[in-house]
Swiss-Prot record:
GO molecular function, one term: 3'-5' exonuclease activity
Protein name in UniProt: Error-prone DNA polymerase
HAMAP family listed in its UniProt record: DNApol_error_prone
Catalytic reaction annotation: DNA(n) + a 2'-deoxyribonucleoside 5'-triphosphate = DNA(n+1) + diphosphate
Broadest EC class assigned to this enzyme: transferase
Keyword terms: Cytoplasm, DNA damage, DNA repair, DNA replication, DNA-directed DNA polymerase, Nucleotidyltransferase, Transferase
Main subcellular location: cytoplasm
Species for this entry: Brucella melitensis biotype 1 (strain ATCC 23456 / CCUG 17765 / NCTC 10094 / 16M)
């Protein structure tokens, strides 16, 4: 068979152009018996690692080759060309070339290249030039110039596009080649692996050009021929040019480069003179141990672990990595920025002694090998959380410390999800915006999987319409396609040498940031280390709470400011509060599911919080581990350990793994260790399982390990049900699960935030509000909860408020919470500073304020709309009227005082009082909360006449009782582990109620569940032994329109369309729900 290499294959990382994944191209090329394939995406290397990972499995079985290249497009008229680096040095130059083009482009994501950029590098590449589709007078001269710049390295690409004039076109291209003295090379200029993808490629093209498939005309491919073709077909097509087929082998002959050649070198850290990195790390660790335990009181167990960890770190030469993270954390603490490591790093006593993590792994009995293992041969991965408001300071420190050409953020691939896929496909197929929106709103979830005909019909559309059917089919295929690259939340890659010779770097949309083209899975594949500089809103909240306590209660805690390490431990009152499910705002345990779990688990110590954090996750739930654990914890069933047959091992071989969780695996590490102990996985197989688990949601690869693990356990005598549950748990962790070390780090913050809520509720509420946006709840819910805990909350006021929410001493209570100007939507911090700066004397009237301040009319209107003039004895309506009478912003300064004086003498108009409901609506619209009431209380009379109960009545209702309730939807949840069950949380003036909707009810009332803001529910009370209450829905009704009756304002200001829903923190009168899938 004649060898043929396809050297111009574009994947879907040629964004909105290629219509196949890199993996699909590699797999299909091998299946068609091609000798090799070159992945060459347009001005990017973003997809090459995925192609490389797919190829690694194939190459073990054959001589099939993969080539890493790029299709270069120029802005100066230079023809497109695919270039392939011959060796590692050439690859580095290709990366730098693309980096230069990305930084030159003014728009993020673009790459502006000119011929001069390639000219001095051209000799290092194999180059195939693509002729223009139509005659260009200067092409022959440009081709000659390119050939002279890289003699012997340039080919002219020849395609057979099946467009009726292939023969004449080929003759023209052959003449160009002869004139320039370059050979022809055959290619199909591939855009997809199979012709079935042509319709999707049409959609991508239309989307790229912001048009429809029907209007795109010549922008679309003329046929479906640009797919991978077998060698015999390419030989037939190029029968008149056999030398072009043979040239593909000549083209690839000098290319030796593979991504395997990338060798990572971690940057050397500055160390004190006379020391090595190993010695410096050794000294820092033992100094930290002395601080934690006392110089002469370090427990022998800790000493042994430190020595063991330091020895392995030295063996693997990871000292610079630990010194880097230590340096970043130390810098943050010197700046007063709270931080804490999490994830697998919490397994390390070295990280604990360096102050990187806050959990003592010896007290929780965590496993260091989960963090670093010589067998895995993978770099460690330390995640550190910083205050979300100050994380950028830390990131810029990293850039300054390592320079822009040696440090960059990892990429995140923004991929199509179900709704975005349907929207783009719908637009491309010419569907109207309302039809596309209706179709998108029938989808629940992030990864799709089809749309039920009934759901399409419920959206008012015809499921038999061929365009609707086509849109759904294409959208399903499009799900998971990359749309563009963005920056990771904080993962940095740092290198000793130039990073832009390993991977291209481009500017991020955010100022002073840059990121590479590979995501976290890609860098794992090629062995690059990263440091995660992450943000966590709760750390911001805790730091602000510590500041408030020190400011207002300096006599407490010995006058010292609290820290993450100094806060009192083992406080019974904190655990008693959590056992009641009283956890609104508390880190990680504030969701409805966690609130329900707390009374059932009844945490009494720190490790219980570790379990609490981890147990409400798909892993334990899908593995059917939650209920057995709770029954054993409560003494309802004995704590037995699964065991193998006597001939295969001791009965207690899982004791060390499952002993502390009562014989039930709850953590990711336990499932992994069971695979090794019970199924006898080798370390390599266990590592494959771990990697499959990490990429399950994206790649769906974990099922390949299922039979091996289950059969391995059953063959050794374990119960099949237990084995299947263990693997289901692993699949659940692939969806979303916590390793024990991660749960332990988060449990530390659970306790601290719960302690603040328990002992300083006014401080905690103020800190939560001042740290927005963060967390699960909207300001209205935070304030309601604070008032239920005895906190006095005072409104925003021009004479008393600051930008932040503050604590204010009042005659009747020690400390009240005063709402700040930050609660007023649209009111700027600059206007706040002006207002406060001139407040040495109280403001007496609005005219007085206007005379003293340089605030524009808009600022005064916002203050009036927020009812912030209470201390002036002016209500909202009077204030709005007074603001309208103020001089225009253009009034000359010379006349301001005179105008104000004249206006002040004008008699006041007697205005009708605003209804209380109008005040509440205006409060929600301006500050997202109201101290005057809840929208539902003004509908209560009518609801009560219909027999509708309050949420409080539902909470107090007897098990099995049928009730009606109505409330504003605050949360919608359809967990993947719940087998189609949907959960709603609704709220009225008395509190919240939890609603359960079974699949058969969801099927009937899907539209109401997905779009209602105010919902009426009939159902039956379900009360557990621990007092957890749900209303199991039987009938639902959308009552959103009822809110219009509360105000004369325009309806669109009250009822936002469901497709405009955002985060629940941004709720107004009709709160936008938070939807989980």
């Amino acid at each position: 068979m004649v060898p043929y290499f396809e050297m111009a294959a574009a994947s879907n990382f040629s964004f909105l152009c290629g219509a196949s994944h890199p993996q699909e191209l590699v797999e299909r090329a091998h299946a068609l018996d091609l000798s090799g394939i070159g992945i060459a995406d347009r001005n990017t290397l973003a997809g090459v690692v995925r192609a490389h990972a797919q190829w690694k499995d194939i190459r073990k079985e054959s001589g099939f080759r993969l080539f890493i290249g790029c299709r270069l497009s120029f802005i100066d008229g230079t023809p497109d060309m695919v270039v392939y680096p011959r060796d590692r040095a050439a690859y580095g130059q290709l990366c730098r070339l693309l980096t230069e083009g990305k930084h030159r482009a003014a728009i993020k994501g673009e790459c502006h290249l000119e011929w001069a950029d390639l000219l001095f590098r051209a000799r290092q590449f194999q180059i195939a030039v693509f002729p223009p589709d139509e005659d260009e007078p200067d092409f022959a001269a440009r081709l000659t110039e390119i050939a002279q710049a890289a003699p012997g390295s340039v080919w002219l690409a020849l395609t057979m596009p099946h467009q009726g004039q292939d023969g004449r076109r080929a003759e023209r291209i052959a003449r160009f080649a002869a004139q320039a003295g370059v050979p022809l090379i055959a290619t199909n200029d591939v855009l997809y692996h199979h012709p079935d993808r042509r319709p999707l490629q049409d959609v991508l093209t239309a989307t790229r050009h912001h048009t429809t498939v029907f209007a795109a005309g010549r922008l679309l491919e003329k046929n479906a021929e640009r797919h991978l073709k077998p060698p015999h077909e390419m030989v037939r097509l190029f029968r008149d040019y056999p030398e072009a087929i043979a040239a593909t082998a000549d083209f690839v002959a000098p290319i030796t480069f593979q991504l395997d050649e990338l060798k990572y070198a971690y940057p050397d850290e500055p160390i004190p003179p006379g020391k090595t990195a190993q010695q410096h790390l050794y000294d820092l660790v033992w100094e930290g141990a002395a601080r934690h335990y006392g110089a002469d009181m370090i427990p022998p167990k800790v000493q042994g672990l430190i020595n063991k960890e330091l020895a392995l770190i030295a063996r693997l030469e990871y000292e610079p990595y630990f010194l880097t993270v230590y340096d970043i954390v130390t810098h943050a603490r010197e700046k007063g920025i709270l931080c804490q490591g999490r994830g697998s790093a919490a397994n390390s006593v070295v990280c604990f002694c360096l102050g990187i993590t806050g959990v003592n792994p010896t007290q929780v009995d965590l496993l260091f090998e989960r963090f670093i293992s010589a067998e895995r041969k993978e770099p460690p991965d330390i995640d550190v959380d910083f205050e979300h408001e100050r994380r950028e300071e830390v990131m810029q420190y990293v850039y300054d410390r390592y320079s822009r050409d040696r440090a960059a953020i990892v990429a995140t691939v923004i991929s199509y999800r179900s709704r975005s896929a349907i929207r783009d496909v719908g637009k491309a197929l010419g569907l109207s915006e309302d039809v596309t929106a209706a179709l998108a709103n029938t989808v629940w979830g992030l990864s799709g999987g089809g749309i039920d005909r009934q759901h399409i019909r419920q959206a008012g559309l015809d499921p038999d319409n061929p365009i609707i059917q086509r849109a759904v089919e294409l959208a399903i295929t499009l799900i998971g396609f990359p749309r563009h690259l963005s920056q990771h939340v904080g993962g940095f890659v740092l290198t000793r040498d130039r990073l832009d010779e390993t991977v291209p770097i481009g500017p991020a949309a955010m100022d002073k940031r840059s990121f590479i083209e590979w995501d976290k899975d890609d860098i794992d594949e090629v062995g690059l280390m990263k440091v995660d500089v992450l943000s966590l809103g709760m750390l911001t909240c805790i730091r602000k709470a510590f500041d408030l306590i020190h400011q207002h209660k300096p006599q407490l805690y010995g006058g010292e400011k609290l820290t993450l390490a100094s806060l009192p431990r083992k406080d019974k009152a904190v655990y008693d509060m959590l056992c009641k499910g009283d956890s609104l705002g508390v880190f990680q345990v504030e969701s409805r599911a966690q609130m329900n779990m707390l009374p059932r688990l009844r945490p009494q110590e720190f490790y219980d919080l570790v379990i609490e954090v981890a147990i409400v996750r798909p892993g334990p739930i899908q593995g059917d581990m939650v209920h057995p654990y709770l029954r054993r914890r409560s003494g309802q069933e004995p704590c037995t350990l699964p065991s193998p047959s006597p001939q295969h091992g001791p009965a207690n071989e899982l004791q060390q793994i499952l002993g502390k969780t009562k014989g039930v695996p709850l953590f990711q590490e336990q499932a992994m260790r069971i695979a090794m102990e019970a199924a006898k996985f080798t370390p390599e197989e266990a590592n494959q399982l771990r990697r499959a688990m990490a990429t399950f949601r994206k790649m769906g690869t974990i099922h390949t390990m299922e039979k091996k693990m289950i059969d391995g356990m059953v063959n050794r005598g374990y119960d099949r049900t237990f084995a299947e549950n263990c693997f289901n748990q692993i699949k659940g962790f692939g969806e979303y699960g916590f390793p024990e070390s991660h749960a332990a780090s988060f449990a530390h913050l659970v306790y601290i935030s719960a302690w603040l809520k328990c002992h300083h509720p006014e401080v905690f509420a103020a800190a939560l509000l001042n740290s927005q946006p963060m967390g699960f709840y909207a300001p209205a819910q935070i304030v309601r909860d604070a008032r239920e805990h005895g906190v006095t909350v005072l409104p925003v006021d021009v004479n008393f408020s600051q930008w932040d929410n503050i604590l204010e001493e009042t005659p009747d209570v020690h400390l009240a919470l005063r709402l700040g100007f930050r609660q007023i939507d649209g009111f700027s911090k600059r206007d706040t500073e002006l207002l406060i700066a001139d407040r040495q004397e109280p403001y007496r009237t609005i005219e007085d304020m206007h005379r003293r301040l340089r605030l524009d009319r808009r600022a005064f209107t916002l203050l009036a709309d927020a009812d912030a003039f209470g201390s002036l004895d002016i209500d909202r309506r009077a204030a709005l009227w007074a603001v309208r009478r103020l001089p225009n912003d253009e009034t000359l300064l010379l006349f301001r005082a005179a105008a104000a004086s004249e206006l002040a003498q004008e008699p006041r108009t007697k205005l009708p009082e605003m209804a209380a409901s109008e005040h509440v609506i205006a409060d929600y619209e301006t500050t997202r909360l109201s101290l005057k009431g809840h929208p539902l209380q003004y509908l209560r009379e009518g609801l009560a006449a219909e027999g509708v109960s309050t949420c409080r009545a539902v909470q107090e209702g007897a098990d099995g009782r049928r009730m009606k309730v109505a409330g504003v939807v605050t949360v919608r949840q359809r967990p993947g582990s719940a087998k189609g069950v949907v959960f709603l949380t609704i709220e009225d003036e008395t509190g919240i109620a939890n609603i359960v909707i079974w699949p058969k009810i969801m099927k009937v009332f899907r539209r109401e569940v997905m779009s209602a803001r105010l919902i009426h529910i009939e159902g039956r009370i379900q009360r557990s032994l621990e007092g957890v209450v749900h209303l199991v829905a039987a009938k639902l009704q959308d009552r959103s329109a009822a809110l219009i009756e509360m105000s004369g304002r325009e309806a669109q200001r009250l009822i936002a369309p469901s497709q405009m829903a955002h985060h629940p923190r941004n709720v107004r009168v009709m709160p936008n729900s938070r939807d989980f899938h």
